[in-house]
Amino acid sequence: MPEPLPTETVPPPKLEVEETPQEQPAIGWIQVITRCAGNARALAGVSVLVTNGTEEQVHLEHTAVTNESGETGKIPLPVPAASLSLNSDETRKPYSTYDVSVYAYGFYRQVSEAVPVFAGKTSRQIFHMIPLPSYLQEPPKTIVYQNTEPNL
């Protein structure tokens, strides 16, 4: 019978990995406010979607519904660290952009595109909800607001 081989524990080789400092993601917020009747009345029960990505691949980040004051709570969203704005050689934007869509029965759908969100700050999006004419059951189109990205 063959003699068993001695068992010897060999530690795995140590890998030399050069770590590059990574910016820790930060948090910024979006708060949605909905009004109607020429800003005279808050609109409760409005569905809110916060998305990002491209037309081909949209990522749902958050959903909410407005309260009796016509507002959502502050919606936390991942954004780059504010320290990016301190480096003049940095090519990445020191903020993220999100699309905010609002839906309510009897009103036109609206979307605010490319809403900039910065670390530690709240971007307030105010929507003036427009009622549908009585002969329409569904809105024929979505009202789109294009935001201009900050020139930093």
Predicted feature residues:
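Short strand-edge motifs at loop-to-beta-strand transitions and within beta-strands
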Residues: T72-G73, E113, S123-Q125
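Beta-strand-rich domain onsets/edges
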Residues: M1-A42, V58, A64, Q137, ...
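Short, acidic Ser/Thr/Gly-rich low-complexity loop/linker segments typical of extracellular
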Residues: E56-L86
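A generic structural motif
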Residues: L49, V79, V115-P116
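Hydrophobic beta-strand segments
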Residues: V46-G53, V100
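A short, solvent-exposed loop/turn motif at the edges and junctions
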Residues: L86-A114
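Short beta-strand edge segments in extracellular beta-sheet folds
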Residues: A114-G120, H128-L132
